[in-house]
Amino acid sequence: KKFRDKSIILVGFGGGFRRTELISIDYEDLEFVPEGLKIAIKRSKTDQYGEGMIKGIPYFNDKNYCPVLNLKKWLEISKIKSGPIFRRFSKGLSLTEKRLTDQSVVLLMKEYLNLAGIENKNFAGHSLRSGFATVAAESGADERSIMAMTGHKTTQMVRRYIREANIFKNNA
């Protein structure tokens, strides 16, 4: 379970995913390439016509926090070769064929924040996506690059993340 949960958190953050996008990923949507991982998103909140998009997650320098390597490890341990990559466990902790719910992502986020001693009332499944956008802005990514990864259709929300990321920069 901990390998699945770590993969959910790292892939969710590394790809700037909404929790509904994250739980909808199937094994068939994955393509491991030399640069990292391509994930086909079939539909999202702002893509109601199902045009889809491809998200690319590069390898991270720190292997412990690399979404690509951790997902490979989860798939190897779980022996998942088709269908949902993020599945429920039974009460006896056997892996089922059933896809996790988006609420499960919220609950596991809160569980791990609690274990880390972090007040979790201000965190939810969306925190992975907003965290990605904020860190990308702090690292100097422009709003179009952030929007391409997160799937935002307008600059309004992305600019909010950039403003939050820049509040301490160039502070007079």
Predicted regions and their residues:
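Residue-level marker of regulatory loop/turn positions in helix-turn-helix DNA-binding domains and
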Residues: 1, 63, 101, 125-126
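Conserved tyrosine-mediated DNA breakage-rejoining catalytic core shared by Y-recombinases
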Residues: 15, 20-68, 73-76
